[in-house]
Amino acid sequence: MLFRSQITVFVGNYDFWYESSQLLIRQQKEANKKAEARAKELREFIARFSANAKRAKSATSRKKELEKLEITDIKPSSRKYPFVDFKFERELGADILKVEGLTKKGFFTDLTFTVKPEDKIGFISESGNTLSMLFDILTGKEEADGGSFKWGSTVIPAYMPQNYDEFFDGVDLTLVRWLDQYSRQHDEEYLRSWLGRMLFSKEEALKKAKVLSGGEKVRCMLAKMMLMQGNFLILDEPTNHLDLESITSLNKGLINFKGPLLLVSHDHELVQTTCSRIIDIEGGVKVYDKDISYDEYIDEQSK
């Protein structure tokens, strides 16, 4: 990886890279601090004794040491981070979401669970399609074969499906006009401000929605979710196609989100840092539901 203008190889996952890169920066800063202190000592010695015949040799030696002393210029990172911040105006009531006996043939049977205002739930399953179908049903994209679910009257869900191509394929709109479809305010500068948060500059905001890359589509979907000010987030594999900086920003945004959350993700760190309840659906049946962190859940399963 190109790190601080040098090629540095980090063997491991994203978490290992991030921790290692931050450690390198801290170590370099500490080395610089010591080098600067030593440089100060050398300059003081040289200034004091360079004119002293008896100490001239020592002063010359100090000058050579000072010339060789390296203080690395730690430049600010050039990496750009989107600004992900999910705010909402409508306060939540006590009733959020109640799912009873929900059934979809070929996916799951008799699913029952209740979401409380403080819940941030990580969903686990051997079948990602099962969880995608569940989220699609809860958001009205698909219909269940049996059972029921009921949203609280104060809830405004904001959903990022795993497959969002339908929002972009063949859509001959600029990003400004694309986002305008989901906004109550239609001022162009207002819309551009939301796109700017997701690193779409003035020119990039005029791109056509149909030509976006996978990562750009995700950033647009995040802009859409923030703009809609949903007080209940549902995200299905939101880190797909995102770069490291965008994943970091999304992670922080979800940690700071004050409403309930339903999340499916293969990103261990994302689930661990944002979710405080785990629901496991295997073979179409709910086999686990507990207020617990992801790491604690993994520890339980390994015993």
What does each of the following model-derived ranges do?
Residues 1-30, 89-303:
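ABC ATP-binding cassette signature C-motif
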Residues 20-110:
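Flexible nucleotide-interacting loop at or near the entrance of a catalytic core
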